[in-house]
UniProtKB/Swiss-Prot annotation:
Residues 609-623 have a biased composition (Acidic residues). Residues 587-623 are annotated as: Disordered. It comes from the Bacteria. The gene is dnaK. Residues 594-605 have a biased composition (Gly residues). The keyword Cell membrane does not apply. Induction: By stress conditions e.g. heat shock. InterPro entries: ATPase_NBD, Chaperone_DnaK, Heat_shock_70_CS, HSP70_C_sf, HSP70_peptide-bd_sf, Hsp_70_fam. GO terms for molecular function: ATP binding; ATP-dependent protein folding chaperone; unfolded protein binding. The keyword GTP-binding does not apply. This is Chaperone protein DnaK. It comes from Mycolicibacterium paratuberculosis (strain ATCC BAA-968 / K-10). Belongs to the heat shock protein 70 family. Acts as a chaperone. Keywords: ATP-binding, Chaperone, Nucleotide-binding, Phosphoprotein, Stress response.
Length: 623
């Protein structure tokens, strides 16, 4: 049975994990790191770079490097590169494809199934977009799981039978969630969740960037926001400074040649940022985490003292101010240090993949919907059918009627949110139920059913009880991708995968050819410069020279077939040269004469075979 992986598709970094012998293992990427930057870059030569290679070239390729695309999931955001439009799903799919490739290389087998995590506070459109990204990457998404739930699953499975209440405080690169879960006897049940989809480590970075821009403007009078390359360098320096301030009281930010003045003289940025100043300029961001925490405690109907364990998730929770705030909010409770905040979500996703594949037994995951769902009714009111923090999957029905006499149809507008007025919430989608027989208002019976699946994706049905006529919508309005568009993107991604494979193959062929040219050229040079002259005729060496010249010409072009052909010819000429040298050496030994020479010649029968075999093997290797 094919194995399934667990993927934490993060705003700044992503992680993939898999079960090995029942235990979750985080898979290192092809660069050797356990986390992969969620960055995609389109190089000017047509190559698509993902992860660390994309991050490495960001400064010199600002306009064609995309990061933090998770913040655009479920919106109509897109970016145009070389005349082609890319959606957030397609960019995310590139990251997923890299994680998939790295996991396949680690396991030595193809992977098609995956569990992908999302922030608990992601709405329906964002979840749908994440699932579409998985499909474009060639993955069968078994389940979309909330990140805090996955973290609790990873943390809580080995904690015995005793029922425990766990608070998961998840502050990632672009999103924030806080969730309260109960774990016991193999059941992980989410009691309540809240959060902010537009709050994360990126915002802390931005504050440092703004601080640096203001400082530089104050000393030089130059506004760096107008220089894209300078801003990219500032962002990278800000992220580094933020990380350093988690373990140091101050950090130096030194960027030479950040820009030039009016006289084209180079200018340098050199600032000292203290932890106290950093906390001062980001205090309001930290305060935004307080209300979701209070909401979760209230929604779950418990007191802070009932919390048994606090689990921190996301790299941003390493900031001392965040840890201190969590301690303050939980009445001094020390957060658990036994989990890696960067990896715990992917580990939980791998465990859930194991549950769905039957590899992990006796575990039940009960997740919740983060926001209320309902429809707009007379007066623009939001009538909720499913309240927030309802355990999913779930199904709820309610009967409505018409607002006007002889109304032939009803418009069903589906919203997600907590506001009393429908328009103030997130419109997920709308559809029409037609063919209602003429009748006074209030007479027709229209049954509206909301069905949320285990991925948190919503299906809505409206049915006229009188005629039995019904209409259904699967909410995907937020992502706006039709099945045809998704199929096209899948094909496009597959085509790019083939392009990437060809490019890697071409690079390998070029490397082999360049290596062979270098080694053969050196060998010929050594022969010509040997003491007593070359052991082989100049004619033989000239043939090798010609083959080297042909190979160099081929390497100067882009025709890989020509390079392969030239490399093959050079290999043959090299082999002929090796054979000629061997024969010349044998002839010299024979001419040496005398008993020693004869003995040497006479005792070399089996040795000849061995030496000959070694020469042939060496030549084959050089091909």
């Amino acid at each position: 049975m094919a194995r399934a992986v667990g993927i934490d598709l993060g705003t700044t970094n992503s992680v993939v994990a898999v079960l090995e012998g029942g235990d979750p293992v985080v898979v290192a990427n092809s660069e050797g790191s356990r986390t992969t930057p969620s960055i995609v870059a389109f190089a000017r030569n047509g190559e698509v770079l993902v992860g660390q290679p994309a991050k490495n070239q960001a400064v010199t390729n600002v306009d064609r490097t995309i990061r933090s695309v998770k913040r655009h999931m479920g919106t109509d955001w897109s970016i145009e590169i070389d005349g082609k439009k890319y959606t957030a799903q397609e960019i995310s799919a590139r990251v997923l494809m890299k994680l998939k490739r790295d996991a396949e290389a680690y396991l030595g087998e193809d992977i098609t199934d995956a569990v992908i995590t999302v922030p608990a506070y992601f709405n329906d459109a964002q979840r749908q977009a994440t699932k579409e990204a998985g499909q474009i990457a060639g993955l069968n998404v078994l389940r979309i799981v909330n990140e805090p739930t996955a973290a609790a699953l990873a943390y809580g499975l080995d904690k015995g039978e005793k029922e425990q209440t766990i608070l998961v405080f998840d502050l990632g690169g672009g999103t924030f969630d806080v969730s309260l879960l109960e774990i016991g006897e193999g059941v992980v049940e989410v009691r309540a969740t809240s959060g902010d989809n537009q709050l994360g480590g990126d915002d802390w970075d931005d504050r440092i960037v703004n601080w640096l821009v203001d400082k530089f403007k104050g000393t030089s009078g130059i506004d760096l926001t107008k220089d894209k390359m300078a801003m990219q360098r500032l962002r990278e320096a800000a992220e580094k400074a933020k990380i350093e301030l988690s373990s140091s009281q101050s950090t130096s930010i030194n960027l030479p040649y950040i820009t030039v003045d009016a006289d084209k003289n180079p200018l340098f940025l050199d600032e000292q940022l203290t932890r106290a100043e950093f906390q001062r300029i980001t205090q309001d961001l930290l305060d935004r985490t307080r209300q979701p925490f209070k909401s979760v405690i209230a929604d779950a109907g418990i007191s802070v003292s009932d919390i048994d364990h606090v689990v921190l998730v996301g790299g941003s929770t390493r900031m001392p101010a965040v840890t201190d705030l969590v301690k303050e909010l939980t009445g001094g409770k020390e957060p658990n240090k036994g989990v890696n905040p960067d990896e715990v979500v992917a580990v939980g996703a791998a465990l859930q993949a194991g549950v769905l594949k039957g590899e992990v037994k006796d575990v039940l995951l009960l997740d919740v919907t983060p926001l209320s769902l309902g429809i707009e009714t007379k007066g623009g009111v939001m009538t909720k059918l499913i309240e927030r923090n309802t355990t999913i999957p779930t199904k709820r029905s309610e009967t409505f009627t018409t607002a006007d006499d002889n109304q032939p149809s009803v418009q069903i507008q589906v919203y997600q949110g907590e506001r009393e007025i429908a328009a103030h919430n997130k419109l997920l989608g709308s559809f029409e139920l037609t063919g209602i027989p003429p009748a006074p208002r209030g007479v027709p019976q229209i049954e509206v059913t909301f069905d949320i699946d285990a991925n948190g994706i919503v299906h809505v049905t409206a049915k006229d009880k009188g005629t039995g006529k019904e209409n259904t919508i699967k909410i995907q309005e937020g992502s706006g991708l039709s099945k045809e568009e998704i199929d096209r993107m899948i094909k496009d991604a597959e085509a790019h995968a083939e392009e990437d494979r060809k490019r890697r193959e071409e690079a390998d062929v070029r490397n082999q050819a360049e290596s062979l040219v270098y080694q053969t050229e050196k060998f010929v040079k050594d022969q010509r410069e040997a003491e007593g002259g070359s052991k082989v005729p100049e004619e033989t060496l000239s043939k090798v020279d010609a083959a080297i010249a042909d190979a160099k010409t081929a390497l100067g072009g882009t025709d890989i077939t020509a390079i392969k052909s030239a490399m093959e010819k050079l290999g043959q000429e090299s082999q002929a040269l090796g054979q000629a040298i061997y024969e010349a050496t044998q002839a010299e030994s024979a001419q040496a004469g005398g008993p020693d020479g004869a003995a040497a010649g006479g005792g070399s029968g089996s040795a000849d075979d061995v030496v000959d075999a070694e020469v042939v093997d060496d030549d084959r290797e050089s091909k």
